[in-house]
Structure formats: structure tokens, C-alpha cells
Amino acid sequence: MESKFKFAADAVLRGKAYPALAQWSATPFSDEWRQFGYCWPYTVPCELHEHCVTHDFAFDIDTVSHIQGTDYFYTIGLGFFDFNIDYFDLVPEQVFQQGLTVLFYYHEGDNPARIKQRLDQLCYLHGLDIDCYLFVSGNTAADKIKNFAWFPDHELLYWHRNQAVPATPIHWDHRPYRFTILNRSHKWWRATVMADLDRHGVLDVSQWSYNTNVTVGDDPADNPIEIDSLELRDDVEQFMARGPYCCDDLTADQHNDHHLHVPEHYTYSYCHIVIETHFDTDQSGGAFLTEKTFKPIKHGQPFVIVGAPGTLQALRDLGYRTFDQVIDNSYDLELNNTRRWQLARNAIIDIQRQDPDAWLRICREDIIHNQQHFLATKRDRLNTLYDKLLHQLATT
């Protein structure tokens, strides 16, 4: 029997489901359609619908008022999860009357355990069964939580948005830089990483960027790396004072445009040091993969990932290879944030000591495998998610 999602929506316009609970008014394919995430209650067009279209995964979609049966998901795409919003108070009463399952779809890495606690509180407040909803999260810890499921949305999102850009041809000639290191926005742990790499001479052999002007309200006190234990406070302050740093001609907005591509970021260096979005994923114990990781995979580079513990294992679970034969990836197992960074830094320094051309040749088979694996259809990812959700429903 063919797997098929059944989605319920408040309205369907020109084949697109109108974002659930939304107060903002817009029509598909307009500039306003991209503004939902900035307007209360910050629900957005559900990317899961688009992934099904892109990868030819069967689905039905209809309005709540027209559907028959209870085997439909009332999908709520979240721009971000706001703990001050009572989501169930906004859900149409007909959804609960018809026995539909509310499906939250959230591609960010916030701690899913905290989200579950909040949603369960709201269920109790409204007299709802806590099994009335399922939640899809970009945090791998979700797979360990009842009614939650992990899905690597950013893999499919980058696959789709960068689809018009051919994968960068892999070459084996000499390259002018050892590493590529890109930072579009400032966080204090990222500045700590970059200052430490600078102190060890890694930036001297790298093409790299760090935009000190784009900030996200990060508090220095929340730095998960113990900056004073590494005696880096002065180095970080000096590093920030000299910024911003760039290695291309793109603007900050263009750096965040997944449709754009700078081939030299991948062809001019041997290894990509990925500075991920989160280093400790909101104290969740999970990992969070974004387009930052999938860019070097698509465009043919080995990588070291400066991110949460278990990030490399999450990639392996998705079928990717992590160059264990030439990189000491033990850092991925370290739970202590400061120690994990030290181990990752040591792995980077060890790569720098190698003959770069010989090192790259050893990586050849895995580079090619990763690129081809990324370019393949992601229909299997959707099927895995479908099975996860049905299993959750069957065990409620």
C-alpha cells in the first residue's frame, strides 16, 4: 500500500495550504506570502507540503470543512516556537471535533523537551488529550520524546533552494587554502572559536569570514565555551574589534540566500570548517543540522563540524560519511562544551600538519559518495518521517 500523507488546512489557495492559525493576509507566490514568520502568531507555510511536491511523495490536502475521516494531519508550520502563545486556543474547534491530529512542523533546534512541557500544559488547560498532537523538530533529541519526531528539514530545504545550482565539480589539483570557514552572523561562542583558531595560526592558511555587524542578541554570559579557562577573553575582544571580515563580495542578506553559490569557497580549499548554528542546542542533548553542513557536502569538500555533540553521528545515520579515516572525530562524542571545542580544534590543527594533496586523495571516495548521496531524491526521508508519525499514532 502506498504511503500517503493526508493534510488538513484552514484554506487552500492556488494549490497552497494557507498557514494554519495565521492572522496575516497574503496570497501564494506574492511578496507578502513570505512575511508570515514576522507576524503573530508566527506560523508559516508548512515546508513539509513543499517537500512532498519536490520529491514526489504522495499526499492529499483539503480544508477542514471538506475532509472525511480522522486520518488527517492539521499541519501548523512554525516560524519559531513562542512559549507565550496558546496555540490550541487558536486551533479551529472543528479540528478537535473531527478527531484530527494537530501536527506541528518546526525546523529549528530548540529544546524539544521544553516545547513538549509547554504543549502538554496547554492540553491540560483546554481539557485536551496530550496525544491530540504530534511535533516534528529539527533537533535529533526529538526522537527520544513521546509524540515527537526528528526530521532533517534543512537538508531538504537546501536541496530544493539550491537545486538550480549544479554541484561544484570536484577537482584534485593543488588549492591555495587549507580551510574555508564562514560565519554570517556573530555569536560569542563563534567568536571564541575564531579567536582560538587565529591564535593557533589556522586563519593564516584559510579563506574565512566573520560578520561582526550581524548580531542575534547573544549574551556573552551564555557562551557555552569557558572562555577564561582557555585564556581567550582578550583575544576575543581584539578579534571582534578588528571586524568585520569577509572573503567574498556578497552582502549579509545574500549570504543567507540559499539560491546563491560561491564556487571558490569549495574549490580553493581542502577542508570546510563548518561553524554550525548551535553548539549545545538549548541544553537538549540533541544535534541540529543546517544548510551550513550540507553546503560542503553538495559541493565536494571534507569537513569538520563545530557544533553540538552527536552531529557527525546524525550525518552517519542519514547515510553520509564523515572522513573518520583521516580526521580524529572523537570530538563528536564529548559532552562538555569546552572540551569538545578543544578536541575539534586539535583535529583541525592535525589536518593542517598533513600533506594537503595526499590528505585529499584519501578523502576522494567519501567526497564523491557524499555529493551523490545528497543529490539523490529525498523521498526516503519523507517515508521515514511518515513511518515515525504513524508509529507514534499507533502507540498513543
What are these regions (language model features)?
Residues 2-274, 280-290, 294-299, 303-396:
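Pol beta-like nucleotidyltransferase catalytic core
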